[in-house]
Amino acid sequence: MKKKTVSILLTAAMALSLAACGSSNSTDSSSKSSSKAESISASSASSEAESASSAKSTADGEVFDDTTVTVFAAKSLNSVMEMLISEYNKTQPNVKLVGSYDSSGTLMTQIEEGASCDVFFSAAAKQMDQLEGENLLVEGTRHNIVNNQVCVVTYEGSNTEVTGLEDLNKASSIALADGSVPVGKYTREALVNAGILEKADDVSAITTQQVSEALGGVEINECANVGAVTSAVAEGSNEVGTVYYSDTYGLEDRLKVLQVVPYDLTGNVIYPAAQVANKEADETEQAAAKDFVEFLTSDEAAAIFRNYYFDTEVE
C-alpha cells in the first residue's frame, strides 16, 4: 500500500506542475492520472496475486522448499498413486514424490535392511505391524487409508467353468501370489474359511503346493506380487487368478470378474500408511513425508481412491 500511495502522489505532483486538471479528494482525479493510477493498482494487484499464488499453503500453512520424498507402496497402488501424487503437487509443487512398487512383504524387508524410504503404504496390516514393532515408523503417523476386496478373475473371452473360490479346481491353471504377498495371504484365508484348505496358525505359511493339492492338483503359477497375477491372467497365460478389485481398474476389456470374495471369508483388506523413520532425511523431507501421509486421509484423496475401486469406509 505504501508503494501505491507514493506512486499516486508522484503522479499528482507531475500533473500539477504541468498545469493540468485540478485535484479532487486530496488526489489527482484527471482521466490521465486516474488511468495511470488504475494501471499501477492493477499491476500491484497482479503482483500481489502472483505472490499469494506462489505462497499457496497446505492445511497447516506451510509450503515446502524443494525436496524429494520416497514412497514404498504396494504394487496394487501403482495406478492410483500417480493420480494422488498429481493432486498433492497442486498445493506442494516443490515436493518430488518418487514411488517404488512391489509386494508389501518385499518392501518391508527392504526397509528393515536400511533402504532409504520416507513413507510406507502397505496392502496389509501385518507388514506395518512388524515395522512398528521394530521402531522403524514415526510414532503417531500411522493411518488406515482404504479397504479393498479380493476377486477371482479370468481373461475376457475365456470359456472357464470357474465361478469363484468354491470351484477353483475346475481351472486348468491358476495364477496365485505367494503367501508372503498380502493378496496371496488373503486368498489362503478365504480358502481356509471356505473349507477348501485346512486351518493353519499362519495362513501365509501355506505353500503353493499345499494349495494345489487341496484343489486336486491343479497347476498353479506362483507370482511375486499382485501385478504379476493380474498380467498373467489378462494375457491369458493362466485361466484364472485372485487379485484385488482395484487391480481390475482400466482392464475392464481384458479381465472378467467371476467373484468378489466377501469380507467374511477374507476379513477386511486394510491398507495402512505411515511415515518411515528415515535417519538420512533432513527436516524438510521429514515434514513433507508426514504431510503426504496426512494428505492420504483427506477428502480429495478419498475421491481419487473411490475412482480406482477402493473402499474408503475404514476405521
Where are these regions (language model features)?
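C-terminal motif of bacterial Sec signal peptides marking the signal peptidase cleavage site
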Residues: 16-20
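Short, high-confidence coil segments that cap the C-terminus of an alpha-helix
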Residues: 94, 116-117, 238
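Ligand-binding clamshell of periplasmic/extracellular solute-binding protein-like
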Residues: 99-109, 116-132
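Positively charged n-region of N-terminal signal peptides that target proteins for export
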Residues: 1-10
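Central helical "cap/lid" subdomain
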Residues: 135, 139-143
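Exported/periplasmic ABC-transporter solute-binding proteins
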Residues: 23-26, 32, 36-38, 42-86, ...
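A generic structural motif
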Residues: 92-99
